Regions:
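Soluble non-cytosolic domains of exported or imported proteins
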Residues: 5-8, 67-75, 119-127
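Short, small-residue-biased leader/transition segments that mark boundaries at the very start
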Residues: 1-3
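Active-site microenvironments of hydrolase-like enzyme catalytic domains
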Residues: 20-61
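Alpha-helical scaffolding within the catalytic cores
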Residues: 14, 37-44, 95-101
Length: 139
């Protein structure tokens, strides 16, 4: 299945969930960064544990796919990242802008978050999700 087909399929799921749960306004598309080989595992030490580093990927109007929410999505990512830097310095790598929409037009707070890379352990990825949830609760 090509990437365009995967996003078409996931769009149906996201739209169904948003329709059934009108109170949701944050849409997080979680991925693992496929960069490098299995030895690349970006981490940050928080307290006594290592967490996989996170990275926002925000689609923009720069490509074929245009959507009006991309600047709001970017503002949301910056807001989350600023709070994360305050609470857990180093949890996030710099935000990446891409020339695609990645279905991020569905909300003004929709984004991809890359959770570590292929070398990170499940425990490191779960630790980063724990910290991310605490950051979002603080917003």
């Amino acid at each position: 299945m090509c990437i365009r087909d995967r996003y078409s399929s996931s769009l149906e799921t996201v739209e169904k969930i948003l329709k059934e749960n009108s109170g949701y306004d944050i849409v997080l598309d979680l991925h693992r960064d496929a960069i490098g080989d299995n030895t690349y595992a970006p981490t940050v030490k928080i307290g006594e544990e290592y967490a996989a580093q996170l990275m926002f990927v925000i689609g923009s109007n720069g490509g074929v796919d245009e959507h009006e929410n991309w600047q709001e999505n970017l503002k949301f990512a910056v807001k989350v990242q600023e709070k994360a830097n305050e609470l857990y310095p180093g949890l996030f790598k710099p935000i990446i802008l891409r020339n695609s929409d990645y279905n991020q037009f569905v909300s003004k707070a929709a984004c991809i978050i890359e959770v570590g890379a292929t070398g990170n352990t499940l425990e490191q990825c779960l630790a980063s999700m724990k910290y991310l949830s605490k950051v979002i609760r603080e917003l």
